[in-house]
């Protein structure tokens, strides 16, 4: 699709160059949209004209007024059932009026620039996907299971899953009037990659991130009282054999569904804090699993956290509540303990525990446009972050599902060698590794740990070193950058937030951290200046080492004391408030 955008002093006029019979008009004063027959005659002053706009994200209101969000580039990443899926690129926010920012106070102007940078950062992350004619928010099973009367004549925006419709609240002006729905283009944060196998078979992996309770690693954990969990992602693997013949297998990941937090405090592993009473936690958990059952059927919980430390308390609280639920099979596999020493071959122990459920749940299979069988249940996998261990296990689960698919139906459709050999191994492992990196970056800021196993099928020393590098990056980002990133998620997913009273985000680290490190360097400098050289005598070595260790220890104590001022925290909302609503 190529859209011409004409920006006048009174309205935006959008013309689909593929269909000039109708044009979309957005009135800047009333913020209402309407359809005009043909290209309207325009006697108004044209401020700007942009050709080849690829889509409209919607209209967002900030302190100074409204902005039209568009994107001007896209990248074709996959084709599913003959319909193309694209990655959104080159986002632009256009103010309704050129001088609208100058009409507000200088502090409000500064705050608005910051809010604009948050929106631009999120939308320009290249993590958003869309399709002009494919309902990207629904799995293939849900698309085929939806009745014709529900979808007949309806636009994409009217039938998609609101959990994955990230710009739903920004296109309301297009959904209120008849005939405007065709301009609605749902965008979804997630991951899409597709490769060809054996010349004709298409292997596609799609992930959709739930916008409810979205955010960053340590700022958003657990569940809210509506049953929404942090880092909630639905992943669908599609094997397309020929036109109208394909299989689909779906699984999900999400934070442990209890009221708990782990806010950053400069500690490598911050303390876990629990919220609410027994009733509140049970109600939230039951609501979550009720939603899972309505969407997918029976649930197998694969809990990968440690049976020691803070993770043990979480695991025990989770196990106690979830075992009383019907249609839920709970498996606690202590990944780190069982697979320590890079013994990832021991993951076969877990797969033996899951094989019966894999057979029972099956997969979705359509042959020549007709439903042959449906997937009857879902695997819900989690670790503490729902990233690294989770991605490793999800890739194994889907591989075993693929083996079942090949044994039961695909062997009649394609050669048995399609899912064997070097080409398949390369495609499968690399797509799942790319997926792990993308989902991890959205939540933690870095690629996934343990991804060398996903990419190559084995752990190696180089992968361990890469994990160390990513762990250091995560520590820095989670403590000193995630406040801004969390505010970006919150601002975009909560357009009703009152920005007139919101506190402006401050860059970190502030002066306390500077003073602390200045003290360390000063102590080291003075030690070198006045104490005997560390190389001249044992006494000199002991003296300098004592000063160095003491300075570092004192600096760390000061840092922990002032961590509230040092850690980059979100400012658009109070962190604790998300556990009270």
Curated annotation (Swiss-Prot):
Membrane topology: Multi-pass membrane protein
Name of the protein: Phosphatidylinositol-3-phosphatase SAC1
Keywords, ordered alphabetically: Endoplasmic reticulum, Golgi apparatus, Hydrolase, Membrane, Transmembrane, Transmembrane helix
Main location, first listed in the record: endoplasmic reticulum
Function: Phosphoinositide phosphatase which catalyzes the hydrolysis of phosphatidylinositol 3-phosphate (PtdIns(3)P) and phosphatidylinositol 4-phosphate (PtdIns(4)P). Has low activity towards phosphatidylinositol-3,5-bisphosphate (PtdIns(3,5)P2).
Listed EC numbers: 3.1.3.64
Gene: sac1
Organism placement in taxonomy: Eukaryota, Amoebozoa, Evosea, Eumycetozoa, Dictyostelia
Alphabetized GO MF terms: phosphatidylinositol-3-phosphate phosphatase activity; phosphatidylinositol-4-phosphate phosphatase activity
Location(s), subcellular: Endoplasmic reticulum membrane; Golgi apparatus membrane
Lumenal side: 533-535
Cytoplasmic side: 1-511, 557-581
Cystine pairs: none
């Amino acid at each position: 699709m190529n859209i011409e955008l004409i920006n006048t002093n009174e309205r935006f006029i959008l013309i689909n160059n593929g269909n000039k019979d109708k044009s979309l008009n957005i009135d800047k004063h009333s913020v209402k949209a309407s359809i005009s027959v043909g290209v309207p005659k325009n006697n108004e002053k044209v401020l700007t004209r942009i050709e080849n706009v690829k889509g409209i994200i919607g209209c967002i209101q900030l302190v100074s007024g409204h902005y039209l969000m568009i994107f001007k580039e896209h990248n074709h990443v996959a084709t599913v059932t003959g319909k193309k899926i694209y990655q959104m690129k080159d986002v632009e926010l256009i103010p309704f009026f050129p001088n609208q920012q100058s009409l507000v106070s200088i502090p409000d102007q500064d705050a608005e620039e910051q809010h604009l940078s948050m929106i631009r950062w999120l939308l320009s992350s290249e993590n958003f996907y869309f399709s002009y004619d494919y309902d990207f928010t629904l799995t293939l099973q849900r698309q085929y299971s939806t009745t014709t009367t529900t979808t007949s004549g309806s636009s994409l925006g009217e039938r998609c899953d609101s959990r994955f419709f990230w710009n739903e609240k920004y296109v309301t002006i297009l959904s209120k009037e008849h005939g405007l729905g065709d301009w609605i283009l749902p965008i979804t944060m997630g991951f899409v990659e597709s490769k060809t196998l054996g010349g004709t078979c298409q292997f596609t992996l799609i992930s959709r991130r739930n916008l409810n309770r979205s955010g960053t690693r340590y700022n958003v954990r657990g569940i809210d009282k509506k049953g929404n969990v942090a880092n909630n992602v639905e992943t669908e693997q599609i094997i397309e054999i020929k036109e109208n013949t394909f299989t689909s297998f779906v699984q999900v990941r999400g934070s442990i569904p209890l009221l708990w937090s782990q806010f950053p405090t400069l500690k490598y592993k911050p303390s876990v804090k629990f919220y609410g009473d027994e009733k509140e936690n049970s109600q939230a958990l039951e609501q979550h699993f009720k939603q899972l059952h309505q969407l997918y059927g029976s649930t197998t919980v694969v809990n990968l956290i440690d049976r020691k430390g803070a993770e043990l308390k979480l695991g025990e609280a989770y196990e106690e509540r979830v075992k009383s639920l019907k249609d839920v099979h709970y498996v606690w596999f202590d990944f780190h303990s069982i697979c320590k020493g890079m013994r990832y071959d021991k993951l076969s122990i877990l797969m033996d525990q899951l094989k019966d459920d894999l057979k029972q749940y099956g997969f979705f299979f359509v042959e020549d446009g007709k439903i042959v069988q449906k997937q009857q249940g879902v695997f819900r996998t989690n670790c503490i972050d729902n990233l690294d261990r989770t991605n490793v296990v999800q890739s194994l689960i889907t591989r075993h599902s693929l083996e079942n698919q090949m044994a039961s139906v695909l062997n009649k459709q394609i050669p048995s060698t399609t899912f064997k050999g070097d080409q398949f191994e390369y495609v499968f492992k690399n797509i799942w590794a790319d997926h792990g990196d993308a989902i991890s970056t959205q939540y933690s800021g870095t690629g996934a740990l343990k991804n060398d196993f996903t990419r190559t099928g084995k752990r190696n020393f180089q992968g361990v070193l890469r994990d160390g590098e990513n762990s250091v990056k995560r520590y820095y980002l989670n403590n000193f950058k995630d406040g801004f990133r969390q505010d970006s998620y919150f601002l975009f997913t909560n357009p009703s937030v009152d920005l007139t009273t919101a506190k402006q985000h401050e860059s970190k680290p502030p002066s306390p951290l500077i003073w602390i490190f200045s003290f360390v360097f000063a102590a080291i400098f003075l030690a070198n200046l006045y104490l005997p050289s560390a190389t001249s005598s044992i006494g000199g070595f002991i003296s300098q080492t004592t000063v160095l260790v003491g300075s570092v220890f004192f600096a760390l104590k000061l840092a922990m004391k002032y961590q509230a001022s040092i850690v980059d925290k979100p400012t658009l909302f109070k962190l604790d408030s998300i556990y009270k609503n």
